[in-house]
């Protein structure tokens, strides 16, 4: 079972390097890792389990956050309309995106960052990604709003980018041009 002690924190080399492409079909170990990552997210969102094991709630996690430099991400959350996004993916890649941007009005957080980081993180308002799922099937997703932000955050992790790298250092609350907030 993955716990917070398994999650590496900012400054760890795996968080600043591009992760390796995962071979498909997935190995038994890669499938198990994906399942474990998914279970961590579910556990972190269950109040009783999270309290028992001192887990911070998360909606996404990437293998580099576990010190594993592979292009593997897991997502588990419901959007504002109650649609469940729950999946483990390998080799996710943004293949197209909008010019329009968006940002979370409350800012972003990260399981690998133990401190509050203030500022807006500009993201594409809409993205299309291609990936492979845990069953070795190709996946193509068109995302907008909060789901698009979550996926971009996790894809950044496999590319060695932390969310705070995208914040305007001179004016952290600068509203990016051509953007709209997401509550």
UniProtKB/Swiss-Prot annotation:
Its cofactor is Fe(2+). The keyword Protein biosynthesis applies. One of its GO terms (biological process) is co-translational protein modification. The active site is at 154. Pfam families: Pep_deformylase (PF01327). GO terms for molecular function: metal ion binding; peptide deformylase activity. It comes from the Bacteria. It catalyses: N-terminal N-formyl-L-methionyl-[peptide] + H2O = N-terminal L-methionyl-[peptide] + formate. Fe cation binds at residues 110, 153, 157. Binds 1 Fe(2+) ion. Its EC number is 3.5.1.88. Gene3D superfamilies: Peptide deformylase (3.90.45.10). Keywords: Hydrolase, Iron, Metal-binding, Protein biosynthesis. Belongs to the polypeptide deformylase family. Removes the formyl group from the N-terminal Met of newly synthesized proteins. Requires at least a dipeptide for an efficient rate of reaction. N-terminal L-methionine is a prerequisite for activity but the enzyme has broad specificity at other positions. This is Peptide deformylase.
